[in-house]
Design a protein with these regions (language model features):
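Intrinsically disordered, low-complexity terminal tails and inter-domain linkers enriched
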Residues: 10-14, 427-430
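Sec-dependent N-terminal signal peptides
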Residues: 12-23
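Short stretches within intrinsically disordered, low-complexity N-terminal or propeptide regions
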Residues: 24-25, 428
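C-terminal motif of bacterial Sec signal peptides marking the signal peptidase cleavage site
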Residues: 27-30
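Patatin-like phospholipase
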Residues: 32-123, 138-438
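Gly/Ala-rich beta-loop-alpha elbow adjacent to hydrolase catalytic centers
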Residues: 125-130
Length: 438
């Protein structure tokens, strides 16, 4: 067992190494070159298009004529695919963010198919992990096996590769540029394997039938939500459609700082630029059509049903927080995201009331208390998938309101007004006279 004096050389060695590291950091700082990035200016923001694919994206915070037109066209396409008629009920599905908790939504969808009551959705939207499952939810029960595979067989190594601690340290002190703690090449490869030419062709086919698939990303420079018309991209025939389709899915699921952003080649005016896009959950944890489509008037007087799957627990969960920077920061961010997600559920409820949609909400139940041991814990995801599956195949009791919402008088419809009395030709009130047709 070495005595105390013998430990001192090790301490001196550590100090020497730290001194060398500091000198190296200063040396590197003088010669590092940032990766070229040429974003459009704010003045050009509303002119930005994907080269060769105009009208396939829109800002989520303002009306979009291209998405509005796509909605109108969807009615004619639906009629053409349905012998000139519109379905009496139209269904929408909104899939939220939640990382590995997306296993819950995958389980709900697969169990719903097993129950035999899962409808065909005219509109499917996805944010973050919801964006990864949205194309397969859109294509229906035939792709349940893909959903199950994606959320029950993967682990951390299938999604990301962490950078070395030294690289992260150099990035933190702004010496060596690094866009994130990890590289997401594994996730890109997973998406490329799951979304092939066949999937793209089937999304295009359903788009031509009047159905719509939308995914949201965050344009990081603009601090705005971008809504992508995925069916229009799939149906475009553009040789780069598949590459773009996959990139959008990855971008929507790229949590800033943990995953690197995705860069999109765009054009505006006479110039070519790059846009930086990250997780759609930065702007909203779940979306419908936001403000890109005016208050819903498309489709006549048919019944509309909106189903929302929130891949997260919505009620507070007690956890003893260690008085350390990492634990306090992690708990604060988790609480912020949970609060934002609840606010988004209320926002969609407001849209539902405005646009006459019946609101149905599913979320991870309180009694699911298993803790994950990593960012993508296979055992945890399998357990959560099974929870969602069992709930749905037994007839899931969808919640009609956002969490803790007390409808009170807000939901109480006034009694119908009595019919005004009929008056005779002499102006006196008399019984209603019914005339038989001739």
């Amino acid at each position: 067992m070495p005595n105390t004096p013998e430990k001192l050389p090790h301490c001196r060695t550590s100090l020497t190494l730290l001194s060398c590291l500091a000198a190296l950091m200063l040396l590197i700082q003088g010669c590092v070159t940032l990766k070229p990035y040429n974003p459009p200016t704010a003045a050009l923001a509303d002119e930005v298009q994907i080269p060769g694919l105009p009208g396939v994206r829109a800002w989520g915070d303002r009306p979009s004529e291209s998405l509005q037109q796509s909605g109108r066209e969807s009615l004619e396409e639906e009629k053409a695919a349905n012998h000139g008629k519109l379905e009496p009920v139209t269904y929408g599905l909104a899939l939220s963010g939640g990382g590995q908790d997306g296993a819950f939504g995958a389980g709900i969808l697969c169990g719903w198919s097993q129950a035999g009551t899962r409808p065909q959705f005219k509109l499917v939207t996805g944010i973050s992990t919801g964006a990864l499952m949205a194309p397969f939810a859109f294509l229906g029960p035939a792709y349940d096996h893909t959903l199950k595979e994606a959320y029950t067989t993967i682990s951390d190594k299938d999604i990301y590769k962490a950078h070395k601690p030294l690289a992260i340290l150099l990035a933190v002190v702004n010496v060596k540029p690094l866009p994130a703690l990890t590289e997401n090449k594994p996730m890109e490869e997973l998406v490329a394997r799951l979304v092939d030419d066949k999937v793209l062709a089937e999304v295009a086919r359903e788009h031509r039938k009047g159905r719509r698939l939308l995914i949201g990303t965050t344009q990081m420079d603009a601090q705005r939500l971008v809504i992508w018309n995925m069916g229009a991209i799939a149906n475009s025939g553009n040789p780069k459609a598949l590459e773009l389709f996959r990139k959008i899915m990855v971008a929507s699921a790229s949590i800033p700082a943990f995953f690197p952003p995705q860069y999109f080649e765009v054009e505006a005016g006479a110039g070519r630029y790059q846009e930086m896009h990250g997780d759609g959950g930065v702007m909203t944890e779940v979306m419908l059509y936001e403000n890109a489509i005016k208050p819903f008037s498309i489709g006549g007087e048919r019944k509309r049903e909106l189903y929302i799957i929130r891949n997260e627990q919505v009620y507070p969960q007690w956890k003893k927080v260690k008085p350390q920077l990492k634990d306090i920061a992690s708990r604060a961010v988790d609480s912020l995201l949970k609060s934002q997600g609840i606010g988004d559920l209320y926002r969609l409820y407001t849209y539902a009331k405005r646009d006459d949609l019946d609101y149905h909400l599913a979320f991870i139940p309180k009694d699911f208390t298993m803790k994950s041991t990593s960012e993508f814990d296979t055992a945890y995801m399998n357990a959560l998938f099974q929870v969602g599956y069992n709930m749905a195949c037994c007839g899931y009791p969808w919640t009609k309101y956002p969490p803790d919402f007390n409808p009170g008088k807000y939901e109480q419809k006034p009694p119908p007004a009595p019919n005004p009395p009929l008056r005779s030709s002499a102006g006196e009130t008399g019984p209603e006279t019914r005339h038989s047709p001739h």
